[in-house]
Every structure is written in C-alpha cells, then in structure tokens.
C-alpha cells in the first residue's frame, strides 16, 4: 500500500508518501508545494493542482489522507479552504480514495494523545518511519503524520 498524506495550505502544501509493506512503514518522499504570495490567488491554486498532479503521477499512491480543516478565525481561512478544495479535486481526478482527519485525531493516532505538541508528533513520526533527521519543513513532517494516520485508521 502506498499513501500520500497532505497538509493543506495556500503558501505551502505539505506532502508525504509512505509505503506499508508487511506492516513496515517506509518513507518514500516528502516535501512541500510552495506558491509565491506575489502571484494571483487563482494562479497559486492552479500551481498547487499541477504540482500535486506531478507528485501523484511520479509516486502513484493507492490512497490519500488529508488534514480536515477545522474552522478558526484567521485572515487566511478562506484561502486555505480554497486550496484544500483544489487538493480534494485533484485527488478526485486521480480517483484516489480519500480519508480526512482533524488535527486532534492525527495527534491521537500518531502519539496516543490528542493534545500532543508538534515535537511529540515529530518524534513519533521519526520513530515509526525509522528516520534519524526530522523532515523539513514542518509541513512535510505534518503530512507524514497525516499519511501514518491514514495507514493506522484504514
């Protein structure tokens, strides 16, 4: 099984690709899709879709896990929701089964505690994937946690 985990955003979309083979989880790739704030929002959304399509074509995941947006008041809320919509549409275009998880559920699945901090989540991700260096940037590490959640809760 190969899964792509996605941490949505407009400026940066984190992604992480994990294989699960006979119970062992192996990180294949992780990184970010970054868009420039100097571009028009619609151009940034197209860039996210195009770059995500390239990642899907390259790694051919069987499924996807996406962080579910929970509402909070912020000047970027609408932009993030729009980016998430583009991400969901792009995943749908490739007919990938999608699981959605709110942040607390991701923390609970990865660490066993729904109120874990970022460092606790990161340490558990590194341990589970047997990696010695923290994935950078944080968005990529978060995407790996989301992918692991998709594996754990399939």
UniProtKB/Swiss-Prot annotation:
EC numbers: 3.1.21.10
Record carries keyword DNA-binding: yes
EC primary class: hydrolase
Keywords: Cytoplasm, DNA damage, DNA recombination, DNA repair, DNA-binding, Endonuclease, Hydrolase, Magnesium, Metal-binding, Nuclease
Catalytic reactions of this protein: Endonucleolytic cleavage at a junction such as a reciprocal single-stranded crossover between two homologous DNA duplexes (Holliday junction)
Xref: InterPro entries: RNaseH-like_sf, RNaseH_sf, X-over_junc_endoDNase_RuvC
Cofactor: Mg(2+)
GO cellular component: cytoplasm; Holliday junction resolvase complex
GO biological process, one term: DNA repair
Residues the entry annotates as binding Mg(2+) 1: 7, 139
Location(s), subcellular: Cytoplasm
Annotated positions binding Mg(2+) 2: 67
Cofactor binding annotation: Binds 2 Mg(2+) ion per subunit.
Family designation: Belongs to the RuvC family.
HAMAP family, alphabetized: RuvC
Functional note: The RuvA-RuvB-RuvC complex processes Holliday junction (HJ) DNA during genetic recombination and DNA repair. Endonuclease that resolves HJ intermediates. Cleaves cruciform DNA by making single-stranded nicks across the HJ at symmetrical positions within the homologous arms, yielding a 5'-phosphate and a 3'-hydroxyl group; requires a central core of homology in the junction. The consensus cleavage sequence is 5'-(A/T)TT(C/G)-3'. Cleavage occurs on the 3'-side of the TT dinucleotide at the point of strand exchange.
Record-given protein name: Crossover junction endodeoxyribonuclease RuvC
Organism: Prochlorococcus marinus (strain NATL1A)
Gene coding for it: ruvC
């Amino acid at each position: 099984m190969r899964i792509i985990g996605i941490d949505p955003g407009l400026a940066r979309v984190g992604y992480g690709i994990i294989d699960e083979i006979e119970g062992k989880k192996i990180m294949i790739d992780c990184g970010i899709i970054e868009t420039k704030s100097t571009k028009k929002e619609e151009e940034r959304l197209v860039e996210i879709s195009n770059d995500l399509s390239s990642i899907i074509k390259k790694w051919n995941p069987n499924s996807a896990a996406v962080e579910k947006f929970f509402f909070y008041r912020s000047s970027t809320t609408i932009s993030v929701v729009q980016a998430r919509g583009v991400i969901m549409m792009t995943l749908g275009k490739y007919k990938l089964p999608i699981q959605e998880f709110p942040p607390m559920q991701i923390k609970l699945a990865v660490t066993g505690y729904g109120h874990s901090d970022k460092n606790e989540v990161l340490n558990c991700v590194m341990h589970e994937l047997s990696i010695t260096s923290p994935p950078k940037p944080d968005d990529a590490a978060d995407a790996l946690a989301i992918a692991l959640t998709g594996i754990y809760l399939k």
